[in-house]
A protein has these predicted regions:
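Aromatic- and glycine-rich beta-strand/loop motifs that create alpha-glucan
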Residues: 1-22, 170
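Membrane-helix interface segments
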Residues: 16-18, 89-95, 170-173
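Junction motif at the cytosolic side of a transmembrane helix
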Residues: 17, 235-257
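Hydrophobic alpha-helical membrane-insertion segments
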Residues: 22-26, 101-117, 177-199
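Secretory targeting signals
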Residues: 28-69, 95-166, 211-237
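Transmembrane helix segments
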Residues: 31-39, 167-208
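Hydrophobic/aromatic residues in alpha-helical transmembrane segments
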Residues: 64-67, 76, 80, 115, ...
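Transmembrane helix boundary and interhelical loop/hinge segments in multi-pass membrane proteins
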Residues: 67-90, 257
Length: 257
Protein backbone atom coordinates (compact mmCIF):
# COMPACT_ATOMS: atom_id res chain seq x y z
CA UNK A 1 0.00 0.00 0.00
CA UNK A 2 2.83 2.39 0.85
CA UNK A 3 4.37 1.92 -2.60
CA UNK A 4 1.02 2.57 -4.28
CA UNK A 5 0.47 5.76 -2.27
CA UNK A 6 3.96 7.00 -3.22
CA UNK A 7 3.22 6.28 -6.88
CA UNK A 8 -0.13 8.07 -6.70
CA UNK A 9 1.44 11.07 -4.98
CA UNK A 10 4.15 11.17 -7.64
CA UNK A 11 1.55 11.15 -10.43
CA UNK A 12 -0.57 13.79 -8.69
CA UNK A 13 2.30 16.17 -8.01
CA UNK A 14 3.58 15.71 -11.56
CA UNK A 15 0.36 17.24 -12.95
CA UNK A 16 0.55 20.95 -13.74
CA UNK A 17 -2.97 21.53 -12.40
CA UNK A 18 -1.78 20.40 -8.96
CA UNK A 19 0.25 23.61 -8.75
CA UNK A 20 -1.38 26.00 -11.23
CA UNK A 21 -4.87 25.96 -9.67
CA UNK A 22 -3.65 26.60 -6.09
CA UNK A 23 -1.46 29.46 -7.39
CA UNK A 24 -4.51 31.01 -9.07
CA UNK A 25 -6.43 30.71 -5.78
CA UNK A 26 -3.55 32.36 -3.90
CA UNK A 27 -3.61 35.25 -6.40
CA UNK A 28 -7.36 35.62 -5.77
CA UNK A 29 -6.72 35.62 -2.01
CA UNK A 30 -4.08 38.33 -2.35
CA UNK A 31 -6.37 40.38 -4.58
CA UNK A 32 -9.20 40.23 -2.04
CA UNK A 33 -6.84 41.25 0.76
CA UNK A 34 -5.58 44.24 -1.25
CA UNK A 35 -9.13 45.27 -2.19
CA UNK A 36 -10.22 44.93 1.43
CA UNK A 37 -7.35 47.15 2.50
CA UNK A 38 -8.13 49.78 -0.15
CA UNK A 39 -11.93 49.62 -0.08
CA UNK A 40 -12.84 48.62 3.47
CA UNK A 41 -16.40 49.91 3.03
CA UNK A 42 -17.00 47.32 0.27
CA UNK A 43 -14.74 44.41 1.23
CA UNK A 44 -14.72 43.46 4.91
CA UNK A 45 -11.31 42.06 5.82
CA UNK A 46 -12.67 40.30 8.92
CA UNK A 47 -15.31 38.43 6.94
CA UNK A 48 -12.82 37.67 4.18
CA UNK A 49 -10.42 36.21 6.73
CA UNK A 50 -13.11 33.93 8.17
CA UNK A 51 -13.52 32.39 4.72
CA UNK A 52 -9.79 32.15 4.11
CA UNK A 53 -10.03 35.08 1.68
CA UNK A 54 -12.38 32.93 -0.46
CA UNK A 55 -9.88 30.04 -0.63
CA UNK A 56 -12.23 27.74 1.30
CA UNK A 57 -14.78 28.14 -1.49
CA UNK A 58 -12.35 27.75 -4.38
CA UNK A 59 -10.60 24.73 -2.86
CA UNK A 60 -13.80 22.70 -3.28
CA UNK A 61 -13.63 23.22 -7.05
CA UNK A 62 -9.94 22.32 -7.04
CA UNK A 63 -10.56 19.04 -5.23
CA UNK A 64 -13.59 18.19 -7.39
CA UNK A 65 -11.29 18.40 -10.42
CA UNK A 66 -8.60 16.27 -8.78
CA UNK A 67 -11.13 13.67 -7.62
CA UNK A 68 -12.77 13.46 -11.04
CA UNK A 69 -9.49 12.87 -12.88
CA UNK A 70 -7.57 10.62 -10.50
CA UNK A 71 -9.57 7.57 -11.63
CA UNK A 72 -10.81 8.46 -15.11
CA UNK A 73 -7.35 9.41 -16.41
CA UNK A 74 -6.01 5.95 -15.49
CA UNK A 75 -8.52 4.34 -17.84
CA UNK A 76 -8.28 7.07 -20.47
CA UNK A 77 -4.51 6.62 -20.88
CA UNK A 78 -4.51 2.88 -20.11
CA UNK A 79 -2.10 3.23 -17.18
CA UNK A 80 -4.42 1.15 -15.02
CA UNK A 81 -3.17 -1.93 -16.88
CA UNK A 82 0.38 -1.34 -15.63
CA UNK A 83 -0.84 -1.40 -12.03
CA UNK A 84 -2.90 -4.55 -12.54
CA UNK A 85 0.00 -6.33 -14.23
CA UNK A 86 2.04 -5.79 -11.06
CA UNK A 87 -0.48 -7.92 -9.16
CA UNK A 88 -1.88 -5.06 -7.08
CA UNK A 89 -5.46 -5.68 -6.06
CA UNK A 90 -8.08 -3.25 -7.32
CA UNK A 91 -9.06 -2.48 -3.73
CA UNK A 92 -5.48 -1.48 -2.88
CA UNK A 93 -5.25 0.68 -5.99
CA UNK A 94 -8.43 2.64 -5.30
CA UNK A 95 -7.75 3.00 -1.56
CA UNK A 96 -4.29 4.40 -2.37
CA UNK A 97 -6.04 7.05 -4.48
CA UNK A 98 -8.30 7.95 -1.53
CA UNK A 99 -5.25 8.32 0.73
CA UNK A 100 -3.44 10.44 -1.87
CA UNK A 101 -6.41 12.80 -2.18
CA UNK A 102 -6.61 13.02 1.62
CA UNK A 103 -2.91 13.93 1.86
CA UNK A 104 -3.22 16.53 -0.90
CA UNK A 105 -6.39 18.07 0.56
CA UNK A 106 -4.78 18.37 4.01
CA UNK A 107 -1.69 20.03 2.52
CA UNK A 108 -3.79 22.45 0.47
CA UNK A 109 -5.94 23.45 3.46
CA UNK A 110 -2.86 23.95 5.63
CA UNK A 111 -1.26 26.14 2.95
CA UNK A 112 -4.39 28.28 2.55
CA UNK A 113 -4.78 28.66 6.32
CA UNK A 114 -1.16 29.81 6.68
CA UNK A 115 -1.49 32.26 3.76
CA UNK A 116 -4.75 33.60 5.26
CA UNK A 117 -2.95 34.25 8.54
CA UNK A 118 -0.10 36.03 6.75
CA UNK A 119 -2.50 38.19 4.74
CA UNK A 120 -4.36 39.12 7.92
CA UNK A 121 -1.13 40.11 9.66
CA UNK A 122 -0.03 42.18 6.65
CA UNK A 123 -3.29 43.96 5.84
CA UNK A 124 -5.26 43.88 9.10
CA UNK A 125 -2.67 43.24 11.79
CA UNK A 126 -4.20 45.69 14.26
CA UNK A 127 -7.27 43.44 14.63
CA UNK A 128 -6.82 40.69 17.21
CA UNK A 129 -7.22 37.11 16.05
CA UNK A 130 -7.82 35.66 19.50
CA UNK A 131 -10.08 38.25 21.15
CA UNK A 132 -13.52 36.94 22.11
CA UNK A 133 -16.65 39.04 22.46
CA UNK A 134 -19.72 38.15 24.48
CA UNK A 135 -21.70 36.80 21.52
CA UNK A 136 -18.96 35.88 19.04
CA UNK A 137 -16.00 33.52 18.94
CA UNK A 138 -12.57 34.84 17.99
CA UNK A 139 -11.62 35.49 14.35
CA UNK A 140 -9.08 32.67 14.45
CA UNK A 141 -11.55 30.14 15.83
CA UNK A 142 -14.15 31.23 13.29
CA UNK A 143 -11.70 30.76 10.42
CA UNK A 144 -10.51 27.36 11.65
CA UNK A 145 -14.08 26.15 12.19
CA UNK A 146 -15.03 27.32 8.70
CA UNK A 147 -12.03 25.41 7.34
CA UNK A 148 -13.09 22.28 9.22
CA UNK A 149 -16.70 22.49 8.07
CA UNK A 150 -15.62 23.10 4.48
CA UNK A 151 -13.16 20.19 4.63
CA UNK A 152 -15.85 17.77 5.79
CA UNK A 153 -18.45 19.03 3.30
CA UNK A 154 -15.84 18.99 0.54
CA UNK A 155 -15.11 15.32 1.15
CA UNK A 156 -18.82 14.56 0.85
CA UNK A 157 -18.78 16.22 -2.59
CA UNK A 158 -15.51 14.49 -3.49
CA UNK A 159 -16.78 11.04 -2.54
CA UNK A 160 -19.79 11.52 -4.83
CA UNK A 161 -17.51 12.89 -7.57
CA UNK A 162 -15.25 9.83 -7.25
CA UNK A 163 -18.26 7.55 -7.60
CA UNK A 164 -19.54 9.29 -10.74
CA UNK A 165 -16.04 9.39 -12.19
CA UNK A 166 -15.67 5.65 -11.61
CA UNK A 167 -18.99 4.88 -13.29
CA UNK A 168 -18.70 7.32 -16.20
CA UNK A 169 -15.88 7.46 -18.74
CA UNK A 170 -15.74 11.25 -19.05
CA UNK A 171 -14.21 13.27 -16.17
CA UNK A 172 -16.26 16.24 -17.37
CA UNK A 173 -19.48 14.57 -16.25
CA UNK A 174 -18.20 13.91 -12.73
CA UNK A 175 -16.87 17.48 -12.47
CA UNK A 176 -20.28 18.84 -13.53
CA UNK A 177 -22.13 16.60 -11.06
CA UNK A 178 -19.78 17.59 -8.23
CA UNK A 179 -20.20 21.31 -8.92
CA UNK A 180 -24.00 21.02 -9.25
CA UNK A 181 -24.15 19.07 -5.97
CA UNK A 182 -22.03 21.75 -4.29
CA UNK A 183 -24.30 24.58 -5.46
CA UNK A 184 -27.54 22.64 -5.02
CA UNK A 185 -27.69 23.44 -1.30
CA UNK A 186 -27.91 27.19 -1.84
CA UNK A 187 -30.15 26.83 -4.91
CA UNK A 188 -32.85 24.69 -3.30
CA UNK A 189 -32.32 25.65 0.35
CA UNK A 190 -35.76 27.28 0.62
CA UNK A 191 -37.51 24.30 -0.94
CA UNK A 192 -35.48 21.88 1.19
CA UNK A 193 -36.47 23.73 4.36
CA UNK A 194 -40.17 23.42 3.49
CA UNK A 195 -39.81 19.71 2.75
CA UNK A 196 -37.91 19.05 5.99
CA UNK A 197 -40.58 20.93 7.96
CA UNK A 198 -43.22 18.65 6.44
CA UNK A 199 -41.28 15.36 6.55
CA UNK A 200 -38.58 15.59 9.19
CA UNK A 201 -36.87 12.35 8.11
CA UNK A 202 -35.76 14.17 4.93
CA UNK A 203 -33.27 16.08 7.10
CA UNK A 204 -30.91 13.10 6.73
CA UNK A 205 -30.48 13.62 2.97
CA UNK A 206 -26.91 14.34 1.75
CA UNK A 207 -27.75 17.85 0.53
CA UNK A 208 -28.74 18.87 4.05
CA UNK A 209 -25.43 17.46 5.30
CA UNK A 210 -23.64 20.08 3.20
CA UNK A 211 -24.96 22.75 5.57
CA UNK A 212 -22.20 21.76 7.96
CA UNK A 213 -20.10 24.36 6.13
CA UNK A 214 -22.21 27.20 7.56
CA UNK A 215 -23.76 25.67 10.67
CA UNK A 216 -20.37 24.98 12.22
CA UNK A 217 -19.91 28.71 12.94
CA UNK A 218 -23.56 29.56 13.67
CA UNK A 219 -25.14 26.45 15.15
CA UNK A 220 -28.01 28.20 16.95
CA UNK A 221 -29.32 29.78 13.74
CA UNK A 222 -28.86 26.97 11.25
CA UNK A 223 -29.98 24.05 13.41
CA UNK A 224 -33.48 25.55 13.18
CA UNK A 225 -33.20 25.15 9.40
CA UNK A 226 -31.42 21.79 9.16
CA UNK A 227 -33.25 20.28 12.16
CA UNK A 228 -29.93 18.66 13.06
CA UNK A 229 -27.41 19.30 15.81
CA UNK A 230 -23.82 19.91 14.79
CA UNK A 231 -22.62 16.49 15.96
CA UNK A 232 -25.41 14.88 13.91
CA UNK A 233 -24.17 16.70 10.81
CA UNK A 234 -20.66 15.40 11.43
CA UNK A 235 -21.93 11.84 11.88
CA UNK A 236 -24.19 12.10 8.83
CA UNK A 237 -21.37 13.42 6.65
CA UNK A 238 -19.03 10.68 7.81
CA UNK A 239 -21.61 7.96 7.08
CA UNK A 240 -22.37 9.30 3.60
CA UNK A 241 -18.67 9.67 2.78
CA UNK A 242 -18.02 6.07 3.84
CA UNK A 243 -21.04 4.81 1.85
CA UNK A 244 -19.97 6.65 -1.32
CA UNK A 245 -16.35 5.50 -1.00
CA UNK A 246 -17.42 1.89 -0.47
CA UNK A 247 -19.55 2.17 -3.61
CA UNK A 248 -16.50 3.57 -5.43
CA UNK A 249 -14.51 0.48 -4.43
CA UNK A 250 -17.31 -1.81 -5.63
CA UNK A 251 -17.68 0.07 -8.94
CA UNK A 252 -13.90 0.16 -9.46
CA UNK A 253 -13.60 -3.60 -8.94
CA UNK A 254 -16.29 -4.23 -11.57
CA UNK A 255 -15.04 -1.64 -14.09
CA UNK A 256 -13.76 -3.05 -17.39
CA UNK A 257 -10.14 -2.28 -18.26
Amino acid sequence: MGTLVKQECFKLFKKKSTYILPIIIIIIMLSLAILGNQYSDVFNLKESFKGGFSSFSWVVFLMIIQASTIISMEFHYGTIKNLLYRNYSRTSIIVSKFITLLIYSLIIFLVFIIISLLLHLIFNGETSLTEHSKNHISLLNSMLLTALGTFVGMWLVMSLTLLISCIMKSPGVSIAVGIVFYFAVSIISGFLTVVIDKWEWVKWNPLNMMNIMVQITDNDTFKKITKLELHELFIGNFIYIVIFLVLVVVAFKKKNV
